């Protein structure tokens, strides 16, 4: 279990999880508000 926690605390794993969460939030936001993500300024 200690080795598994050490593996989870490495930078590539944290980066992959963070990018997956961010992508999921953006996908869900774009699904409910399709015109707001790329709004012209």
Curated annotation (Swiss-Prot):
Its main location: membrane. Keywords: Membrane, Photosynthesis, Photosystem I, Thylakoid, Transmembrane, Transmembrane helix. It comes from the Bacteria. It is a single-pass membrane protein. It is found in: Cellular thylakoid membrane. The chain crosses the membrane at residues 7-27. GO terms for cellular component: photosystem I; plasma membrane-derived thylakoid membrane. Pfam families: PSI_PsaJ (PF01701). GO terms for biological process: photosynthesis. Belongs to the PsaJ family. May help in the organization of the PsaE and PsaF subunits. NCBIfam families: PRK02733.1. This is Photosystem I reaction center subunit IX. It comes from Cyanothece sp. (strain PCC 7425 / ATCC 29141).
């Amino acid at each position: 279990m200690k080795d598994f926690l050490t593996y989870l605390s490495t930078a590539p794993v944290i980066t992959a999880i963070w990018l997956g969460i961010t992508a999921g939030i953006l996908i869900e936001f774009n699904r409910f508000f399709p015109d707001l993500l790329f709004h012209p300024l």
